[in-house]
Regions:
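Residues immediately C-terminal
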Residues: 111, 302-303, 309-310
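P-loop NTPase nucleotide-binding/switch module
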Residues: 171-209, 213, 241-294
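Peripheral, non-AAA+ core regions of ATP-driven protein-machinery
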Residues: 1-218, 222-228, 330, 470-471, ...
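Short loop/turn elements that form and flank the Walker-type P-loop nucleotide-binding site
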Residues: 59-62, 99-100, 132, 150, ...
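Walker B catalytic acidic pair
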Residues: 299, 305-307, 317
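Basic, amphipathic alpha-helical bundle interface domains used for macromolecular binding and assembly
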Residues: 34, 40-45, 58-60, 67-77, ...
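Walker A/P-loop
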Residues: 219-258, 324
Length: 507
């Protein structure tokens, strides 16, 4: 008798149905697993054997072959333990084939038969839904994550014995009640807010514009000027994730984190990889293809502190995802695409010593050193950054004499940003979400710009020798500024402010 149990495995950003087939023949007792599995799957032989025996169930005595089909697809992970165990129980006649049909199973077995959490439970659930399979069995710790996929029943399984009794209809496991799930937000409580920052009004304004329209921003200035604090304050200005975004972000993090993510990700990601991180860890890839930091920052923020300290190859690799909002990784066994729609927030020093343009201290760098340092940021990458802001140190006397306003600037910013979001939502319906999402081909059709503002922009673009990409970025940023001010059309002051942030003066 051949048994068949359905499972799933991640494949790129999506998943693939896997049939766990089992067969037993006469011969010396053995368990062989075939179908391009890795070492973790090979080791499952001993885990499964112990789990079945310690669950007071009989392990068959015979030559057992388990096939993970399709065989041509590489497979890894310990989540095949549970379907392998069920396939063996079907071979032994302890379970019937009908007991395990029309369901997807995934879970790692401990030696005592209990289930441990797995990676990518949400992808298992999504694959089941796409295949019109209504029941999914995953470890209890993963049930809330899998329950993000609606329209199917998610059964939280504590151990192999309880699942066996459920399948035999002796002791029923109830599917998870989605109404009882409470998503806990961490709210970036340790991050600074705008009110914590003294001075830097232009930089604060640029941060507000960046958040309101999802525009990439670069802050340049000497050490101690507050660049990093400004960048981190952006965390507390971001809107909450929508339900669809929670699913996307949780899928990516379930694939890419080194620790197993059991619960849904409900906060917007804020990723800040160190400048020594490898290209594969930031862009994605590796021998086992995984999403990199740019994909883990999807729907959130990628913060690159000291931008020019990153290798040139890493910086140049950002160009395509900044434009296309996804990254494609090519390997011998296929091409894998991951979403990478992030807000880039970067900081940099204007020169190697960091003091170029500082009003109090003198820069000790030669002109050649400054030029070579700034050349690390290529023109094409800089062209993809919407806002560049020079951040100077706040004089000490202003710090001591600073009087905090009784009105919260943070609350004002949040109110204006939410109004801008509402305007964009009404304008674009479901086509786009933010002003920065508009493709250049649609800018003229969608954005309303007055004739005087259009003439002003055309003259400025000619004088500043703006590229085509920069020209359209100025319009998009102008549209965001107009939205923040509640203006139906883009006017000259909006364009003038936007052009200030296109003055590429990183020193």
């Amino acid at each position: 008798m051949i048994s068949r149990v359905i499972s799933a495995t991640p494949y790129g950003f999506n998943g693939q149905i896997i049939e766990v087939e089992g067969d037993m023949s006469k011969g010396l007792p053995s368990l062989q697993i075939v179908g391009m599995g890795n070492k973790a799957i090979d080791e499952s032989r001993d885990r499964v054997r112990s789990a079945i025996k310690n669950s007071s169930l009989d392990f068959p005595k015979g030559k057992i072959i388990i096939n993970l089909a399709p065989a041509e697809l590489p497979k890894d992970g310990s989540h095949f333990d549970l379907p392998i165990a069920l396939s063996i129980l079907c071979i032994n006649g302890v379970l019937n084939q009908n007991d395990v049909s029309n369901a997807v199973f995934a879970g790692e077995l401990a030696l005592d038969g209990s289930l441990r959490p797995i990676r990518s439970a949400i992808i298992t659930a999504e694959v089941a839904k796409n295949q019109k399979i209504k029941s999914v069995y995953v470890p209890a710790q993963n049930a809330e994550q899998a329950a993000l996929v609606t329209g199917i029943d998610i059964f939280p399984v504590e151990n192999l014995k309880s699942l066996f009794l459920h399948l035999k209809k002796e002791k029923i496991i109830k599917p998870i009640d989605r109404s009882s799930i409470k998503n806990v937000s961490h709210d970036h409580k340790n991050a600074p807010i705008i009110d914590d920052i003294y001075g830097q009004e232009q930089a604060k304004r640029a941060i507000q514009i960046a958040v309101a329209g999802r525009h990439n921003i670069l802050l340049s200035g000497p050490p101690g000027s507050g660049k990093t604090m400004l960048a981190k304050s952006l965390k507390n200005l971001l809107p909450a994730l929508s339900e669809d975004e929670i699913v996307e972000v949780t899928k990516l993090h379930s694939l890419g984190e080194h620790t197993i993510i059991s619960n849904p990700i409900v906060d917007r990601p804020f990723r800040s990889p160190h400048h020594t991180a490898s290209r594969a860890s930031i862009i994605g890839g590796g021998s086992k293809v995984q999403p990199g930091e740019i994909s883990l920052a999807h729907r959130g923020v990628l913060f690159l502190d000291e931008l020019l300290e990153y290798p040139r190859t890493v910086l140049e690799s950002l160009r395509q995802p900044l434009e296309d909002h996804e990254i494609t990784v090519s390997r011998a066994n296929g091409k894998f695409s991951f979403p990478a729609n992030f807000l880039l927030v970067a900081t940099m020093n204007p020169c190697p010593c960091g003091l170029l343009g500082d009003p109090e201290k003198t820069c000790v760098c030669s002109q050649n050193q400054i030029l070579n340092y700034q050349k690390r940021l290529s023109g094409p990458l800089l062209d993809r950054i919407d806002l560049t802001v020079s951040v100077s140190r706040v004089p000490h006397e202003k710090l001591l004499n600073n009087k905090m306003s009784t009105k919260s600037q943070q609350d004002t910013f949040l109110s204006e940003i939410h109004k801008a979001y509402s305007i964009q939502r009404d304008r674009y319906k479901c086509s786009y979400k933010y002003n920065n999402d508009i493709p250049s081909s649609d800018v003229d059709k969608i954005t309303s710009i007055s004739e005087s503002a259009k003439t002003f922009l055309t003259n400025a673009a000619r004088k500043l020798d703006l590229s085509t990409r920069s020209y359209f970025k100025v319009i998009k940023v102008s549209r965001t500024i107009a939205d923040l001010e509640g203006s139906a059309s883009i006017e000259i002051p909006h364009v003038a402010e936007s052009l200030q942030y296109r003055q590429i003066n990183i020193g």
